[in-house]
Amino acid sequence: MTVWWITLFSTYFLCLFARMSGKYKYVKGERVFRANALFAGMACAVLIFVSGFRQGIGDTGTYRDLFEKVPASFFGFLTHPTIKTDSGFYAIVAFIKQCISSDSQKVLLCMAIVTIGLIFITYYKNTDMIEMAVFLFITSGCYLVTMNGVRQYLASAILFFCFPMIYKRQWKFYLPIVLLCSTIHQSALIFLLLYFVVDQPAWGNTTKGILFVGIFLFVTYPVTGPLLARALGETQYGNYKEVLISAGAGANMVRVFVMAVPVVLSYLGKDFLRGKEKYYNICLLLHI
């Protein structure tokens, strides 16, 4: 816990200093705020260091064992008989082992550099309060999950970095990236649907529909939970079957309430945010 608190406070104050010493710049004709790159880079380095050199957090041991089994050459990866799913992820691991290092700890470090780096760069480019973005990233549990779900968060970080493409409607670039990310983790395929949904007006019919479906699934979880578990049982995620059935009503209620706070605040400030934040619709619907 000591490392955790040091990470939280050091990154918060480094990002606070970065914002306080930042300034407005013109990027492609648009006036945008940029925090001080030196302090922001130091905060990013702290997050990467803690993640990349972690020991015993979540599935870290499992991933390190897995990295050891992946061939240390790209040719060996192509001919490996047991790699059938999430092949893009294992291809990246094989590339790292061949070109950088075969040490599993260094593979973890490379994954942290890419995942945390992409997330942090996206925060840096799209928020005026980077210290709050990083604070919420850590305290909401997202930072911890990057260490537990390495495949999921690697794919998520790439798609998060590319989300401005949704706003610009650059589907010719975005959709192929989604398909590539699905080779890292198949859950990325949901973004094929989300591309056509999340740029709808906030608090319109789309928002109401998503909230209705979410509440419906929560209320009917005793019925829908086992159905979902049965569907997952025939896939690579079948190991989550028992968790879905035995976990009561799914996610921890405290986490649900915490994650609902930004939604409530965005509703209360919807009239102000609509005209000021260009990514308001996308961020709200993705969060919901």
Where are the predicted features?
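Transmembrane-helix signature of polytopic, membrane-embedded enzymes
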Residues: 120-140
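Transmembrane-embedded, aromatic-rich helix segments that form part
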Residues: 7, 174-176, 187-198
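Short acidic/glycine- and proline-prone juxtamembrane loop motifs at membrane-interface regions
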Residues: 147-153
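Short hydrophobic/aromatic helix or loop-helix immediately within or flanking a transmembrane segment
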Residues: 61-72, 78-101
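Alpha-helical transmembrane segments and terminal signal-anchor/GPI-anchor hydrophobic tails
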Residues: 61-64, 90, 195-288
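Loop-to-helix entry region of an early transmembrane alpha helix in multi-pass inner-membrane enzymes
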Residues: 87, 99-114
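Start-transfer (signal-anchor) and selected internal transmembrane alpha helices
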Residues: 1-47
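Membrane-interface transmembrane helices that cradle and orient dolichyl/undecaprenyl
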Residues: 159-172
